[in-house]
Amino acid sequence: MKINRVKSLNGEITIPGDKSISHRSIMFGSIADGITEVHGFLNGADCISSMNCFRQMGIDIDYDGCVVTVHGKGLHGLSKPEGTLDVGNSGTTTRLISGILAAQPFASRLIGDASICKRPMKRIMTPLSMMGADITSELGNDCAPLLINGKELHGIYYNSPVASAQVKSCVLLAGLYADGETSVTEPYVSRNHTELMLESFGGNIKAEGTTATVKPVDNLVGQKILVPGDISSAAYFLVAGLITPNSCITIKNVGINPTRDGILEVIKAMGGDMEYSNVVSGCGEPTADITVRTSSLKGCVIEGSIIPKLIDEIPAIAVLACFADGETIIRDAQELKVKESNRIDVMVNALSSMGADITATDDGMIIRGGKPLHGAVIDSHLDHRIAMSFAIAGLNANGDTEITGAECVNISYPGFYDDLGGLER
């Protein structure tokens, strides 16, 4: 994929549905009684992996390209899958489904692609084992493939060493099947889509500060779910509108859940010209249309409790910081090392190759903005967020930027390049 510099970007776009919410809609719909209708489902490879896993366990799921209909079979209605469950590239599928599988009356095996088989799974194996689960790493390296033999579980009070919605959700889902109460406490609040959706399905869930607590219920009830646009996908267009000359972009129906809006806080701190309109709340998930315009930006410090609210947006933020005056420091983001790629090293090396003044640290990076970027050949490492971030950087670099493995955007945003190309230039 070749990207060339543009003179401006203008127009409106509607981004695909939120990936986190789409995953959860399939999972909760499958273990609920009755029908769950999902409007705005993200038809990306990761979410299709979740869909296929539950189909393998006997759940009928219809998808007409607009609406997903999940024919739930209740908390105890899943069937033993024939063969291995393939999660593809999806860490969310791997970790969340493990919490459900840990309590089923059958054994299962989870496998994924090469990236998944390098990502850390001890962070879910530890709390699930504390609950009485039988979960092991087939190769003994605390990574997938995972072998899970369903057991009777008991509730625990778990202090998670990382602020991770995937870890929290895994434990809470297991807690639906456990004897007694299950609580997860995190160092910072992570995204709360599981808590919101579980409550809407009739679960007994309480969230106070950094602790979420679930008690088992007899059943969950299928719902109609309206999936908002994914703020992680919106991030690339927010950055594009802010750094491209003579630009104004409006992104419609973006989810602005307070546990996910870190990039919006950063844009404000950097002095970006941004405004909201049509702010509404549906199914507990607030949305808005967001408009950004070309802005003079200044560097800032990004650290602490905001990091879980923008961890997936940091590659895009790093590009943004290259066009800000002064220094931007990102700290407490060591989680970037265990994403689809080591996003600290990949971003620093690739932006450096484009002429950016950027340095890696143990837990983040330091970007000294203001140096003009030039085109380069960028290896996406088959990481969708890397590919999309450098597409935006390439629009504002001198010369051609070539992204290898650019098709990996299909993981979360299959129409990304079409939407980007559809903006007026």
Residue ranges and their predicted role:
Residues 1-425:
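Structural preference for solvent-exposed beta-strand-turn elements
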